[in-house]
């Protein structure tokens, strides 16, 4: 009979004080699979209603910005995956999809009424003048798209349409 953390045939397991194997639960800082009882590694696990964490090769929850299987995710300090959130990480803004939690790339996202951002191929909110889908657009220093305002760009005072935000060349 065994108690505590044990490695058997290269797999990590945990046994309670009553010698029962931990399955589908956390113990000793690790999560143990509900079927096999093996410590879970390199996999997402559900930690609450629509709340997920990712366990690294050591079975520990990851935190911060993480590249996992070619996708970019963010995990809060408690290891819970960010979903449906605009977050700033190391001075760059990212938006994480409300369903998948993946960083949004190459698309516009409306954060609130009238507040739009565009996220590039790296998942970062763009700033300054951008040409997107053939239209000249402008994003302020915070990444918000400018609409219905004049902005100084390249020494010119430019107006950006109130509806779509495109530069109106003759106004």
Regions found by a protein language model. Give the residues of each.
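Extracellular adhesion/carbohydrate-binding repeat motifs centered on closely spaced tryptophans
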Residues: 1-171
């Amino acid at each position: 009979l065994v108690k505590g953390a044990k490695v058997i045939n290269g797999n990590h397991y945990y046994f309670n004080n009553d010698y029962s194997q931990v399955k589908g639960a956390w113990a000793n800082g690790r999560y143990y699979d509900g079927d096999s009882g093996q410590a879970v590694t390199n996999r997402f696990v559900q930690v609450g209603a629509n709340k997920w964490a990712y366990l690294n090769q050591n079975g520990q929850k990851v935190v911060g910005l993480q590249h996992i299987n070619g996708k970019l995710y963010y995990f809060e300090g408690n290891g819970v995956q960010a979903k449906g959130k605009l977050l700033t990480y190391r001075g760059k803004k990212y938006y994480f999809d409300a369903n998948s939690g993946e960083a949004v790339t190459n698309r516009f996202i409306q954060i609130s009424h009238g507040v739009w951002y565009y996220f590039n191929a790296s998942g970062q909110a763009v700033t300054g003048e951008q040409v997107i889908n053939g239209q000249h657009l402008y994003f302020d220093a915070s990444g918000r798209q400018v609409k219905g305002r004049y902005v100084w760009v390249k020494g010119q005072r430019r107006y950006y349409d109130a509806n779509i935000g495109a530069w109106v060349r003759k106004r």
